[in-house]
Amino acid sequence: LGLSKAYLHEDQFFPGWTVLVFHRHVTELFQLAPPERVQLIEEVSRVAGALSEIYHAKKINYELLGNQLPHIHWHLIPRLPDDPAPLEPVWRVPHPPVHLTGVMLQHTIDRVRSALREKR
């Protein structure tokens, strides 16, 4: 990725939940120059496509809010066939947090990186 960095969200109750963070501080999408905006949307799409492929998602939720953290960043959330609350936004689904550690965390990161390499 050129303008952003992708991170797995610390809570993986919704498997594959990824946060894509723009490389410099900007609070609004319209503040970007058109070429940057186009490239950033391409990066969002590339990561979303990789997540969809890895997790066989029925849908990817795209969240670009910024109320709590005023910096351009997307939450990309694969919604799976066995989703526990398919009609609800993830923020409204009470759940115990799921934290990946060690081998599982590295395996997940490696899968995403591999899928992104294929999406170039």
What residue spans do the PLM features occupy?
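HIT superfamily nucleotide-processing domains
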Residues: 1-120
